[in-house]
């Protein structure tokens, strides 16, 4: 299993038509974003004082991420992307 460092996240991209809360996103919105599930999170980042700031998302969250963000990786037969937390646009709450 992949364990990201810092504020990075491992995401499993959903390969189906994108919806947010049951609403299908318009074609142009689908081209700019993708829906993914958070598979793993890094510990977060440290402030200048040394305090740890944990990620805003947790494993299992569904998120909306920028379409071209991240690095494509494989772990066995599974495909994932690794992104920085700044590339997450929203958490999808259902």
Swiss-Prot record:
Q: Which SMART domains does its entry note?
A: Cpn10
Q: Name one GO molecular function term.
A: ATP binding
Task: Report the subcellular localization.
Answer: Cytoplasm
Which Pfam families does the protein's record reference? Cpn10
Which controlled-vocabulary keywords does the entry list? Chaperone, Cytoplasm
Q: According to its UniProt record, where is this protein mainly located?
A: cytoplasm
Which GO BP terms sit in this record? chaperone cofactor-dependent protein refolding
Any one GO CC term of this protein is:
cytoplasm
Summarize the protein's role: Together with the chaperonin GroEL, plays an essential role in assisting protein folding. The GroEL-GroES system forms a nano-cage that allows encapsulation of the non-native substrate proteins and provides a physical environment optimized to promote and accelerate protein folding. GroES binds to the apical surface of the GroEL ring, thereby capping the opening of the GroEL channel.
Q: How does it assemble?
A: Heptamer of 7 subunits arranged in a ring. Interacts with the chaperonin GroEL.
The entry's family comment says: Belongs to the GroES chaperonin family.
Q: What is this protein called?
A: Co-chaperonin GroES
The scientific name of the source species is Streptococcus pneumoniae (strain ATCC 700669 / Spain 23F-1)
């Amino acid at each position: 299993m992949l364990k990201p460092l810092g504020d990075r996240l491992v995401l499993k991209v959903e390969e189906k038509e994108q919806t947010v809360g049951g609403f299908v996103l318009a074609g142009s919105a689908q081209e700019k974003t993708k829906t993914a599930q958070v598979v793993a999170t890094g510990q977060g980042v440290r402030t200048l004082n040394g305090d740890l700031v944990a990620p805003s998302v947790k494993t299992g969250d569904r998120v909306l991420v920028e379409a071209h963000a991240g690095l494509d990786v494989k772990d066995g037969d599974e495909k994932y992307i690794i992104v920085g937390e700044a590339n997450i646009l929203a958490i999808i709450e259902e």
